[in-house]
Each structure stands twice: as C-alpha cells, then as structure tokens.
Amino acid sequence: MTVIANTGDDIWISGNLVCPDLDTVIYTTAGIVSERWWGINGDTFRTHERLASLGQKEALIIGELDRAIHIFRSDLLRRGATLTDATHTISASFQLSAKILPMTDDFVPTTIVTDKGEMHIQDFLVKYQQAPSVSQVRCRPGKMTKEVETALEECRSVVIGPSNPISSIGPILNVNGMRKILKDRFVIAVSPIILSEPISGPAGKFMESRGLPVSSLGVAEFYSDFLDALIVDHRDDISQSDLPDGIELFRADTIMYGIEQSKKLATEIVRILAHQS
C-alpha cells in the first residue's frame, strides 16, 4: 500500500518543518498516534511550554517526541535531502510496511482568504479556531515527484479517504498532472459529510467558498472529473440519481470511532475494489 499525503498544511515552527498530515499518517500507520489524531501518544510538552514562557508562542502544540521528528527532518532537508527522502528515512525508523509519500517536494502552503485577511491554514485552524468567514482557499500547485508518479502508474485503484475535500485532498489534486493521471485509474472516495454536516473540521466553510453544496453531492462534484465510485454513510439521504453520470454510489458506516470501525470500512472498500477488478 502507498499513501500520498497532503503537505499543504506544512509550516515552519521554531526553525523546524512541521508536516501535520504527513506525520499523522506515519504515526497512525506506526500505531503511535495520540487519541486526538495528531502527535504521538504519551508525549509531553515541556519544551513547548518553556518556549511560551520565554515569549515564543508556537502556532501548534508540539510534544517532545514529535519535535524530535521535526528536528531530524529539517536537518535532513538542510543537508540536501528532499522531503520524499526524509519521509522515507523517518518511515524506515518505524519499520512501516506501507510506503508513505509526500504529495510533492515543493513547499506549497495552503492559505485561507478570510474577513481577517489571508492566513496560513494552521493559523486559521488553531489561532483563529476556524471562526473567520472564508472567501477562498488557495492551494499552490506543486511539482509531482517521480515517486508519486511511479506509484500512480503502477496502481490500478486509488482510494480517497474521508478528509476535507478542499484543504486536505484539494492540495494533492492541485499537484501538476494529478487529476489527469487519476482519470485513467479506478478512483473511489469516502464522503466526509453526512446529510449537510461535515464529520469534523471546516469542510462546510471551505466547500461553500468554492460554490459547492455542503453535502456528499458537493464532494462528488468536486471529484467529478475522475471519480468512479463514492461511499456515503448509510444515514445520508443522497441517491444514485443525484450523482453525476459515471459515479456509482455505495453505502457504509463511515464514522470511524475506533480501530474496529476503521477495519470494517476498510473491508468494505476492499470488497468494492475486488468487485471492480
């Protein structure tokens, strides 16, 4: 299995590159992610607290074990490694069986245009607690790496998880050539919205800023140029006739409260993919 992770939320903090989505994928795959779904389970925050007492308030709350990864990654980058190289080295340290790839080696931070001005997505999420009204989500295009291109060329199917379509998946789709390659693959996505309610995060605000309905239909429309199948929660009221032509509708329990629910959803995805092969 290969996972292509969003790097649009990457941010330099206290001299180190923090890659929230990329690291969450690594920590989750390694079985050490915290119950908050970010950072490392059991981590401590004395360095973060000490920096704050010195007047250096960091944009994110970073634990000691998590910070060690950021320091190590940043040192590799300063010595000439690419983000892909650094990610491979970090993944190897956890002995991961899955291949984790950043969507690009370029630094392409996502910014949010709001009534408080344009800001990095982490400032919108953490500093402003998602409160400002949103008029635009800006995802800068990055260059596709050879590793990502090869992974996509060698696969038959692509699964898009139930992440925020605009700010988590959108930056990946904005990588040069990504949407074109996906048109030649079987692509299945899991909707992160039930009825008109996002499962978590500011997906609603971000979709509205793109003129999309806050619904599974809006998700399908955003992916419509390459999507073959959409999994929605069994409580959703969308029907097959609502979807754009060429997209098949499936239903499942899409809320992942824990590992058992996650496994059940993964099993359903594998079943659908097996039926398509």
What do the PLM-derived regions correspond to, one by one?
Residues 85, 140-154:
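A short, well-structured juxtamembrane/interface segment
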Residues 139-141, 164-175:
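Active-site glycine- and acidic-residue-rich loops that bind
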Residues 155-166:
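Short acidic, glycine-rich surface-loop motifs adjacent to enzyme active sites
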